[in-house]
Amino acid sequence: DGTGYDIDTANFPDMAGFVNWAHENGVMLLFNDHTHKTDKQALDPEELKYHTENLTNLLKLGVDGWWYDRNWGYTLHSPYADSITFTTFGEVLYNDILASYTSVKRLFLLCNADWVRHGHVESAPSVIGRRYGIQWTGDITSEAMQLRREVVNMVEKTTAGASPYMSSDLGGFKRAKEQSEAMFTRWIQYGALSPVFRIHSTMELGGAKYDKLPYTYSAETQTVLKTYMNLRYNLLP
């Protein structure tokens, strides 16, 4: 059902070998975490043991980080819901599990900013949440209006929220109409000047095929995309 920590051996018969191959080719791997359903609280000893053991087993394979994809909010409950949201509580737990695994490698955590849900601001930024990893603004659409919101979200979060490593699902994630090359170009231009440049991998949105691979677009569009991608890396210190 797409949850849990078991490896799909039909598609990955040798996960350790796959991880090694990726690293040999300069690719870092971030696993997306969707765990089972439960009504237990986040500090329940059995739940802590379950997540710690399973996350650690995958880290031993060489995984470079975790995408904490809101799932703890749907499966566990914060014991301090009035002051610490489920999103932030999950960030704390996942971060501690990563940190306890190794002190010589900087593993990283991608997590949802708890003040915004699916690109829409819901509350003031969390004081606690700003401490943890790379954050993103949730499952957003690909339309121009959402791109406009993301520019505002990025400025507000990186300044008022004091969380410098913010990111968006570049190109959008859901409910898209047929996507134009011009619209995808605008997303890349925005992303190139954002703290984190991350194109979302969804290839079909709202029943319409939507290719996110830059090299599949026209030669003219590729030239523009390459220009902005190169600009980003030229600006990096």
Please report, for each region that a protein language model flagged, where it lies by residue.
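Catalytic-domain carbohydrate-binding cleft regions of carbohydrate-active enzymes
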Residues: 1-237
